[in-house]
């Protein structure tokens, strides 16, 4: 990640390798990415933001956006691109709980934690009622939960961690009951689905289309300009 190039893979315990598109992730947002961002509403939380191309593009558009990632290198790269980011798991406390307008799970990040149901439940707690989730799904119809290592095909880094791979149909199955379909599409060989939360907000405040990012805890390169903490 720090080098900005691969090859890197997720390696399953049976030896199967899933290539990671490090070069694309470390580049600027491409036309497919920008189309996704055009669909975002209000404040945007990019879960598993990686090197931050999407957060940086949103910031360049003047949008209130925050990336989160467990990788320090990813957070640092996001900041260098001009975005705002926190080193944090999606399952930890977030600024603006229950008030985000859009949550992104791009680049297969619906697999975070290896439990799609738990992740979708968590996202409902982050979004305002009726908030938008945009998820990038696997290019093929698959529904698997695995344990993986990050590897360059020769050596592995860190401990194994749980991951999931979902096609669009599998995602829609997991979403039944708590989510409404808001669209699905394919672009540039990539597949996406949009869902609307049906959950009620735990926040006592009404949903507002204003920044929900805490300036005390967010790394930023905005010359010290505060981002309102609602």
Where do the protein language model's features map onto the residues?
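S-adenosyl-L-methionine
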Residues: 1-39
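Conserved class I S-adenosyl-L-methionine
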Residues: 41-50
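Conserved SAM/SAH-binding beta-strand->alpha-helix loop
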Residues: 71
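Conserved SAM-binding strand-loop segment of SAM-dependent methyltransferases
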Residues: 82-92
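A short acidic, Gly/Pro-enriched loop at the edge of an enzyme's catalytic core
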Residues: 91-103
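A short, conserved alpha-helix within the catalytic core of class I
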Residues: 111-122
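Conserved beta-strand signature within the Rossmann-like core of class I S-adenosyl-L-methionine
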Residues: 130-138
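Short alpha-helix
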Residues: 160-178
